[in-house]
Amino acid sequence: MNLKTPTISHVRLISLYWSRYALRSGAGLVYLLIALIFGLSVAHILIMPVEQLMALQKRQIGKTDPQLIRKTIVDIGQPIVQFVLGIKSFEEVTKEAAALQPGPPDNTSTAAQTGKNAAGFDPWTNFLIEKKPALLSVIFLILLFGMPFVISFLAFNQISGDIQNHGLRYLLLRTKRSNIYFGRFLGTAIFSTVVMAIIVATITFYLGMKTRIYPALDLAGWAVQGFLALAILMIPYIAVCSLISASVDSPFLSLVLAKVAIAGVLLIAILGSFAWKPSKYLLYALPWGWQNNLLHPAPAHWLGAALASLAYTAFFLMLGYYRFERRDL
């Protein structure tokens, strides 16, 4: 079978049309609504306690102390971030939280605990919650985990709907399968990237204007890096949905299979690791195993994660295209 080379002008035209069509389609609107609700809800849940702490400070001392607020965020966020990054286990985080609970004063144990915490403050955690705006870092970590579950609402129906109603036969009179396949993938990626930009910009603007605990330039710079991490991460998951959508005839089945594939890999790896430790490596079947590295301080790590995203994208995209070229429409 001959895999045909896409025509750049056709791919560009189809991608621009598809990205605009996504905004008018039911799938695009559902994705936009779910993504906005999820992203802004995460931000609200994390920012609200900070606002309450600021209000409490204002009542008690007549003003807010940004330095004290930032320190409180770091103290609370450190074990959580270390758990999310896989640096510490849940048991270790629980023990540290218990050690911080009020109790009888013990200078020896307190000093030992302080030394232990300082020694365990790894460079990655230090980068995320000390060198960068900690609140925004935690929001980004949650979005990196949650957005792959949301992206399938946008990307599930790139091809399958037109296969079901045989609409592609009319399009193929004017263009090639390769142009349709890659154009729709690119259009979906463009729409997803725009939505990520809206979410990150809204959260950053609100955090900066409402709390004023971080310098504006620090927030803006970290927001750009977080946006790039989210935008890059969505691309391989969109490619997975492209593969599934090109392989089945039903949009509903495509959505179900996309959900099962994305969530199933994570679930099987986590549950399987309790019985057999090597099961955790199943996470690397999808970007789950390394996606947090997109926020790593070392260039080798975040660049490696970005290149891995492109490699996963190329693999799933070409697998889907091979299937799409061979199948009967």
Where are these regions (language model features)?
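Hydrophobic alpha-helical membrane-insertion segments
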Residues: 31-47, 188-198, 257-273
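Transmembrane helix-loop junction
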Residues: 21, 161, 173, 204, ...
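Helix-loop-helix units of permease transmembrane domains in multi-pass membrane transporters
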Residues: 158-190
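Aromatic- and glycine-rich beta-strand/loop motifs that create alpha-glucan
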Residues: 1-35
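Secretory targeting signals
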Residues: 41-71, 106, 110-157, 181-252, ...
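Hydrophobic core positions of alpha-helical segments in small-molecule transporters
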Residues: 31-34, 182-183, 254-257, 308, ...
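Terminal transmembrane helical anchor/hairpin motif
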Residues: 8, 45-78, 82-134, 257-329
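Alpha-helical transmembrane segments of multipass membrane proteins
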Residues: 18, 201-205, 239-243, 263, ...
